[in-house]
Amino acid sequence: MIKQRTLKNVIRATGVGLHTGEKVYLTLRPAAPNSGIKFRRVDLAEPVVIDARPDNVGDTTLSTTLVKGDVRISTVEHLLSAFAGLGIDNAYVDVSAPEVPIMDGSAGPFVFLIQSAGVQEQEAPKQFIRIKRPLQVEDGDKWARFEPHDGFKVTFTIDFDHPVFDKNSQTASIEFSSTSFVKEIARARTFGFMRDIEMLRKNRLALGGSMDNAIVVDKFRVLNEDGLRSGDEFVKHKILDAIGDLYLLGHSLIGSFTGYKSGHGLNNHLLCELLKARDAWEMVSFEDEGYAPISYMRTAPAGR
């Protein structure tokens, strides 16, 4: 039987919020079977728990933000992507601020934290959502689509009219496994344009952004001294984001996702439409690991 997974141990880290610039204390804790991923604001007089679910997404400006009443937890997608990549079904995520720390702008540090905590299999079957028919949402020339597929495949295309993007790949595809996620996707960093930074900061956004946690691009080039980690790092980060956004379903997917210039808002719209279309998906589990179309490593060394 493919079993649900949680963390073996509690693990802690400290970082800064990308948009708030605040110091954030992060704690990842094990959770019981069928708990799902639960985020907790522990800096409030009474801690507030927000389940990682599509209907709890209240804002998708520049990141995916979970909302309950007037309580917010932003930038959840990179950590959710790491949970998805290592097959973690159940965990508590405690944060001391309204944002998950940005770390280095990728999912790599979160993969390292999860591996350091250890992965614990639980005595409950892992539930997958299998896509049964195509489903697409659109916004102008942008679109996102699910299709049936025997595995989990993510394809993404970005389209930036810019010298740096013109000479690097703007389309990428990954056939998902823990190995491919850790090696190919996890270390792709978020990126931003110098021209946008002043406007963002006037709006109290990107206050914690720096070249330590993002790829920064001016009119002509990448400004980071160490350059890109790979020629397709920009589009690979969009795949990383999409994997995190899709994990708000609370289950690993069996199917293909294709995004064309899609972002957090359109990704979430697709999830909400999927959940409404009950003929488009089904829940499945696997008694025999050999029949499962997706493989998860027990441990996967974080790439350097």
From Swiss-Prot:
<keyword id="KW-0862">Zinc</keyword>
<keyword id="KW-0444">Lipid biosynthesis</keyword>
<keyword id="KW-0479">Metal-binding</keyword>
<comment type="similarity">
    <text>Belongs to the LpxC family.</text>
</comment>
<feature type="binding site">
    <location>
        <position position="78"/>
    </location>
    <ligand>
        <name>Zn(2+)</name>
    </ligand>
</feature>
<feature type="active site" description="Proton donor">
    <location>
        <position position="264"/>
    </location>
</feature>
<dbReference type="InterPro" id="IPR004463">
    <property type="entry name" value="UDP-acyl_GlcNac_deAcase"/>
</dbReference>
<feature type="binding site">
    <location>
        <position position="237"/>
    </location>
    <ligand>
        <name>Zn(2+)</name>
    </ligand>
</feature>
<keyword id="KW-0443">Lipid metabolism</keyword>
<dbReference type="GO" id="GO:0103117">
    <property type="term" value="F:UDP-3-O-acyl-N-acetylglucosamine deacetylase activity"/>
</dbReference>
<dbReference type="InterPro" id="IPR011334">
    <property type="entry name" value="UDP-acyl_GlcNac_deAcase_C"/>
</dbReference>
<dbReference type="GO" id="GO:0016020">
    <property type="term" value="C:membrane"/>
</dbReference>
<comment type="pathway">
    <text>Glycolipid biosynthesis; lipid IV(A) biosynthesis; lipid IV(A) from (3R)-3-hydroxytetradecanoyl-[acyl-carrier-protein] and UDP-N-acetyl-alpha-D-glucosamine: step 2/6.</text>
</comment>
<dbReference type="GO" id="GO:0046872">
    <property type="term" value="F:metal ion binding"/>
</dbReference>
<protein>
    <recommendedName>
        <fullName>UDP-3-O-acyl-N-acetylglucosamine deacetylase</fullName>
        <ecNumber>3.5.1.108</ecNumber>
    </recommendedName>
</protein>
<dbReference type="InterPro" id="IPR015870">
    <property type="entry name" value="UDP-acyl_N-AcGlcN_deAcase_N"/>
</dbReference>
<dbReference type="GO" id="GO:0009245">
    <property type="term" value="P:lipid A biosynthetic process"/>
</dbReference>
<keyword id="KW-0378">Hydrolase</keyword>
<comment type="function">
    <text>Catalyzes the hydrolysis of UDP-3-O-myristoyl-N-acetylglucosamine to form UDP-3-O-myristoylglucosamine and acetate, the committed step in lipid A biosynthesis.</text>
</comment>
<dbReference type="Pfam" id="PF03331">
    <property type="entry name" value="LpxC"/>
</dbReference>
<dbReference type="InterPro" id="IPR020568">
    <property type="entry name" value="Ribosomal_Su5_D2-typ_SF"/>
</dbReference>
<keyword id="KW-0441">Lipid A biosynthesis</keyword>
<feature type="binding site">
    <location>
        <position position="241"/>
    </location>
    <ligand>
        <name>Zn(2+)</name>
    </ligand>
</feature>
